[in-house]
Curated annotation (Swiss-Prot):
Biological processes per GO annotation: biotin biosynthetic process
Gene: bioB
Domain of life: Bacteria
Pathway the protein acts in: Cofactor biosynthesis; biotin biosynthesis; biotin from 7,8-diaminononanoate: step 2/2
Name of the protein in its database record: Biotin synthase
Organism name: Chromohalobacter salexigens (strain ATCC BAA-138 / DSM 3043 / CIP 106854 / NCIMB 13768 / 1H11)
Domain Radical SAM core: from-to ranges: 56-283
Binding of [4Fe-4S] cluster, residues: C71, C75, C78
Amino acid sequence: MTAQSRDPAWTDASPTFQPTMRHDWSLEEIEALFALPFNDLLFRAQQVHRAHFDPNAVQVSTLLSIKTGACPEDCKYCPQSGHYNTGLGKEKLLEIEKVVEQARAAKAAGASRFCMGAAWRSPREKDLRVVTEMVGRVKALGLETCMTLGMVDVDQARRLAEAGLDYYNHNLDTSPDYYGEIITTRTYADRLETLANVREAGMKVCSGGILGMGEAPRDRAALLQQLVRLDPHPESVPINMLVKVPGTPMENVEDMDPLTFIRAIAVARILMPKSHVRLSAGREQMDESTQALAFLAGANSIFYGDTLLTTGNPQVERDRALFDKLGLHPEPSDPHADDAHRDDEQAEIALAHAIQRQRDDALFYDATRG
């Protein structure tokens, strides 16, 4: 059997190769991609990646939890859920000035995007007024902005967009069939509706899922199929590996094979050629070789730093060392900006100072991960 007959998406590997943008992938086609020989799959994914991106550029973000704990949702993986005893205390919404301070530090550390997350089912009116001001203040620093605040209706989405919010994150988490095993307090349709509201308001969509929650291989394919059906595709697609947190129902789930995770990264890249595929939660548990394979498979976005909301994230120095080993560099806010910005000496000095200032700052969530 030839490689062409094995791969339902196979096209010529010439320098003029251009992947096809599709929204109609069948589940069987996606499963066939997952089943490809590993080297064939990664080769195909790297072809797609190079057709649309600088293959050595990685979009770098910082993530700050602006309101932590006591979420009313019952997501079985989440330490912020009020349904489980994970030792995570409830915190009030951060003051605007504290958020702006952390955004300044993030920019000094080299981040191009500042993401803010709140443990809510949906933002209340008084909270929405505060977070829209946060967006404007952070945006004024020259950073791209992203928020994850739970479900939003059309009016809330429009107000966030008017405030200048660039991206809104709302993950699908898993397949429609497996979803009820993970969450019961909101429906899959609720999630899709929020994404539709975000898109209608004119914001960019950040949406992905979590792997390693006990789902079947077909569920992973079905999750990606749901993301591909979104038109347009999400601009950012975080692929998370479950971080098992003591006290959650998922704390004893069987570990996921890292190579299975890499396959999912590669398939996501093939299916969504122009999206940034984010290597997200779970990166702390990955060795350098696994992370390198993820970048080869098409991951090109990460959170950079010490903490991803309430779960661990590699240290800044380790992230920078890995970038150096692999010859990677941060993607500028404008992907077509002059390459000289990547090696700016002043940014290097600022980064070193920022790391030192932030070592003991519990509020800071740096970003090279995702």
